C-alpha cells in the first residue's frame, strides 16, 4: 500500500508522458476533483494503458501548499484499466473550450510513484478469461483459419473472424477461436434504444465515432447452431452468449434465438446459454426461458429512471420492463446479472445506492458486474443534463455497503459458467 499520494502525470503532445513532482494527483467524482485515499491505489494492471487527454489540464494538489491547481506543463493523462477491474475515480482535469470530445473509452485517474504507474481501482473479478497475458495472436490466427475452413459458408463465423477477432481483437471472439470459455453470438443488426454512448453505431453528425462496426445481417438459426454446439461440447467452462458489443438488441431476434436454443439443446446439455440485453422485452425473455435460456445480463447506466432514459433513449419499451425481465428470469430459476456502468460520482451517489438496494430486494438479483463506463465524462453529464450529482460515498464504500447488506450477491465482470453458478462460485471458473 502507498504511504503517500502518487504524483500527477502529463503528456507533451508527442507521445511522451512525464510526472510532475510538484503536484500530487487527484481523482474525479461527478464534476469534482478530490484527493484519493492512499489505500485505494494499486499498480496499473497488465493490459492497462495510458491516454493523453488533448485540450485538458490535469488538476493536482500542490506538494508545498496543499492547494489544488492545474498542471500547465502539458495535457492531462488518464488510464484505461483492463477488464476484470473496477475504477474508483476518474481522471481529474479542466477542459479547455476547444477540446475535442474524448472517444468511447474509460478514463481512470493515474499517478506516478517509485517508478511505477498507479491507478485507483480493484480487481473485482478473479476469472482470467480476458487477461491480456492469456492471448497468443498466432494461436488466435490458427483458430480463425481452422474455423473458416470448417464453416466456409457461415456468415457469423466470418464476422467473428474478420471483424471481431482480427480487426478489433475482441477478447470474446479471440477466446472462441482459441476454443475456450465464452463464445459470442451477435444476432441483431437492429436496436430499440438509441444510447448516446453506443459503441456500434453513432449518427454522422455526432462528435464521436463508434468503436466498432455493427453486424449488418440477420443470422439464421442454422448459422448459430453450426458453430455453438461444437463449442459447448468441447470448451472448458463453456458459455454461449447472445448480445454483443457489435450488434443492436438481441431480444428483437427472439424468435430466431428461441429456435436456436431448442436445436442446441437437442444436441448437447453441456454449458450455459446466456443473453446480454437491455432487458426491454420481458415476454420474449419468458419465451426463451421456457426453452432453456440459463442466464440474463441486463445493461444499464443507472437504476434511476431520470438518469437511465436520457442515456438509453428507449424506443417502444418502458424503464420498468428492465426489472420485469430480471424477475421473469428468476421465476424460471435462472441466473440474473446487471451490467452496471460505473461512473464515480453518479453510481456511488446516495440516491443511486438507495435505488439499487430496492432493485436487489425486488428482483432477487444474483450478480452485479461492475463495468467501467466507456464515455467522455463531461460529454456524458452534459448529454443527460446533470449539473449536480448529489452526495456521494465513493465507489469502494458502495461495494462494501451493498455486500454487507446483501452477502449472497456476487460481484464480478463476466458472465459465470454453469460450473460456477451451480458449484463453488469462488473456485469453479478459469483461473
Named regions from a protein language model:
Residues 182, 186, 202-259, 265-284, ...:
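Core AdoMet radical
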Residues 245-247, 278-280, 301-303, 341-343, ...:
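Active-site beta-loop-alpha junctions enriched in small/polar residues
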Residues 254-269, 320-334, 389-411:
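Alpha-helix-loop-beta-strand connector modules within alpha/beta enzyme cores
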Residues 168-203, 239-242:
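N-terminal pre-triad scaffold of radical SAM enzymes
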Residues 1-151, 354-431:
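Auxiliary Fe-S-binding modules of radical SAM enzymes
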Residues 142-146, 150, 155-170, 199-227:
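Short, flexible helix-coil linker/hinge segments at the edges of structured domains or between repeats
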Residues 283-290, 345-362:
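Catalytic cores of alpha/beta
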Residues 313-315, 325-352:
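Conserved strand-turn element in the central/C-terminal portion of the radical SAM core barrel
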